[in-house]
Amino acid sequence: SPALSGLDPGAHALVRIATLIAVDAAPPSYMSAVSAALDAGLSMEQIVETLIAVMPTVGVARVVSAAPKLGLALGYDVSEAFEVVASDDLER
């Protein structure tokens, strides 16, 4: 809990998200951490920037694996986004 960690709620939520990225957690695991981050007043951009912050430590492959999971937790329709990219590639 944030009270036990000594961190403010926003920092605590970002640490939780960073940990989920590091351990390659399943998509449902991101839901409560993202909810806590948003409840703490963090923006979606700040939450996504966690991917960039942890990349030097966890590696690109782990961040690439985590990005769609984090996107789903933020409410993005990740499969639709991939379909748009695929159709754009077909049109070229």
Provide a role label for each language-model segment.
Residues 1-11, 22-24, 28-31, 35, ...:
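Acidic, glycine/proline-rich low-complexity segments that act as flexible tails and inter-domain linkers
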Residues 13, 53, 58-61:
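Substrate/cofactor-recognition hotspot
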